[in-house]
Amino acid sequence: MPAYKRILLKLSGEALMGDDAFGINHATIVRMVEEIAEVTRMGVQVAVVIGGGNIFRGVAGGSVGMDRATADYMGMLATVMNALALGDTMDKAGLIARVMSAIGIERVVEPYVRPKALQYLEEGKVVIFAAGTGNPFFTTDTAAALRGAEIGAEIVLKATKVDGVYTADPKKDPRATRYTNITFDEAMGKNLEVMDATAFALCRDQKLPIKVFSIFKHGALKRVVQGEDEGTLVHV
């Protein structure tokens, strides 16, 4: 039995790269879609917010000397490319996906309209939110928090390369231990990087829990949705 009826899954663009240096790794995106399909078959309504860091990062090297707002818009367009790839892979896997963009590109994807997104979710379709919040200076983590709150998701699942939040960087400190669960205030007090400050504050204010887990662990998404001890739960 799933522990949640409606979830917001935040995927980083980097997660789509697999072992590649950039871009979209076909085997990786197919495997991710299989994991999502398994959850939808349990009757869970799934919405996805996807990043664009595998193609372009507004805050990174490719944008040196560039106007920040322009760089952020380029990053948003990168998320649209990822969303289209994810949606196409879902369609081929037998899922019905709908890509909705926060910036208008009507010939490519439909615009984000909240009632329409809710309708799609109720119909069992997977909704993929592209282009972040549609505004520069906001991360896709913030978009995940915002869309999660808007659609009434019960939890934001942040899929990362690490299987939870640790007391220290597990790559640098072998004594680092994983938190099973932690409150928002504790995470802030310990300066633990769960999400950026804006996204984190929005989730905290809306009492929207965050689960940090590794998308690279086979079956992890299903275990999270079933309420098992996987990753780290950040709660009020």
From Swiss-Prot:
Look up keyword Membrane and say if it applies: no
Listed binding positions for UMP are: G52, D72, T133, G134, N135, P136, F137, F138, T139, T140
Q: Which InterPro entries match?
A: AceGlu_kinase-like_sf, Asp/Glu/Uridylate_kinase, Uridylate_kinase, Uridylate_kinase_bac
Any single Gene Ontology cellular-component annotation: cytosol
A molecular function annotated in GO for this UniProt entry is: UMP kinase activity
Q: Specify the domain of life of the species encoding this protein.
A: Bacteria
Q: In which pathway does it act?
A: Pyrimidine metabolism; CTP biosynthesis via de novo pathway; UDP from UMP (UMPK route): step 1/1
- Which EC numbers does the record give? 2.7.4.22
Using the UniProt record, name the top-level EC class of this enzyme in a single word.
transferase
Q: What family does the database annotate?
A: Belongs to the UMP kinase family.
**Database matches in NCBIfam families:** pyrH_bact
Q: Which HAMAP family match?
A: PyrH_B
Function as written in the Swiss-Prot or TrEMBL entry:
Catalyzes the reversible phosphorylation of UMP to UDP.
The protein in question is named Uridylate kinase
